[in-house]
Amino acid sequence: MNYEFEREIGFINSQPSLAECLTSFPPVADTFQSSSIKTSTLSHSTLIPPPFEQTIPSLNPGSHPRHGAGGRPKPSPAGSRGSPVPAGALQPPEYPWMKEKKAAKKTALLPAAAAAATAAATGPACLSHKESLEIADGSGGGSRRLRTAYTNTQLLELEKEFHFNKYLCRPRRVEIAALLDLTERQVKVWFQNRRMKHKRQTQCKENQNSEGKCKSLEDSEKVEEDEEEKTLFEQALSVSGALLEREGYTFQQNALSQQQAPNGHNGDSQSFPVSPLTSNEKNLKHFQHQSPTVPNCLSTMGQNCGAGLNNDSPEALEVPSLQDFSVFSTDSCLQLSDAVSPSLPGSLDSPVDISADSLDFFTDTLTTIDLQHLNY
């Protein structure tokens, strides 16, 4: 073999193959392997499962075809039959610690069931609160623990203690448990639950207070917004009222100015006939006081009026014509009627003779004034 290695080393990049290396080593003694397997299976057949090589025949060195061809002795069938290989492969072994755990569970359940059976058989016995709770805890079977039922006195004392101390030290907890006939664990659990309840209550109160504050803030904001809207509305109303007042005032001023404009024209027209009216009144008064001279004045007036109506003389232009009387207003008509009416009966009663032309002139003027007043 060494000669073969030396011969191959002479070539470049020549290395021995894996098959040559495996075949070059001497085979391991099959007797040692078989004896060790037999002793192990016989001594630890109950505790240790069979080796992995025996369960899978392809991994067994004796089943390899090359080794079988090499003249290795096969394991005896008697030894393979004597070993409990199929039992270990089908069923997992049971170890001592597993047996102890199951036995402990069964023994723990038996006394509780026996105690419950004795209590039921003997009738209502006088048991303490702690023993009844222990029986209830044990009879639950470990699946679910029953809820502890506290008496009113126990709850009162626990609430009193919680009011002063939210957390209990161990000596105080032991003392309370001894006084109230409870276990230390029950007192501890009660205080834990009570602290959680207190926390929930405080959180709910804080949330309610915060919500109340938020609501109050929202309400105040809404009230402020409403007040602002009201003030804006009132301001708008006041502004609109002021505008309406101004518009009404301007409208009234315009109406007054429009009314004053024709009145002004009437006033201008009234100013023209005022002098003849006043002169007529004076003349009428003068007629009453000076009766002898009246026929001369009236005759001259009648002649002048007739001349003004018939001829285009310059004297006729001074006398108001019929067109000038068309501008008279109602006040001027009333004044004229008041001025003329008292003079007529006086003139009729007086012995003075009035000509027909002057009477015709007065009647014509009055009829024209009345017609114009009706048309207006």
Curated annotation (Swiss-Prot):
InterPro entries: HD, HD_metazoa, Homeobox_Antennapedia_CS, Homeobox_CS, Homeodomain-like_sf. SUPFAM superfamilies: Homeodomain-like. A motif (Antp-type hexapeptide) lies at residues 94-99. It comes from the Eukaryota. Its main location: nucleus. Residues 143-202 bind DNA. This is Homeobox protein Hox-A2. Keywords: Developmental protein, Disease variant, DNA-binding, Homeobox, Nucleus, Transcription, Transcription regulation. Sequence-specific transcription factor which is part of a developmental regulatory system that provides cells with specific positional identities on the anterior-posterior axis. Residues 42-93, 198-229, 257-279 are annotated as: Disordered. Belongs to the Antp homeobox family. Proboscipedia subfamily. GO terms for cellular component: chromatin; intracellular membrane-bounded organelle; nucleoplasm; nucleus. It is found in: Nucleus. It is linked to Microtia, hearing impairment, and cleft palate: A disease characterized by microtia, mixed symmetric severe to profound hearing impairment, and partial cleft palate. Microtia is a congenital deformity of the outer ear that is small and abnormally shaped. In classic microtia, the pinna is essentially absent, except for a vertical sausage-shaped skin remnant. The superior aspect of this sausage-shaped skin remnant consists of underlying unorganized cartilage, and the inferior aspect of this remnant consists of a relatively well-formed lobule. One of its GO terms (biological process) is anterior/posterior pattern specification. It comes from Homo sapiens. GO terms for molecular function: DNA-binding transcription factor activity, RNA polymerase II-specific; DNA-binding transcription repressor activity, RNA polymerase II-specific; RNA polymerase II cis-regulatory region sequence-specific DNA binding; sequence-specific double-stranded DNA binding. SMART domains: HOX (SM00389).
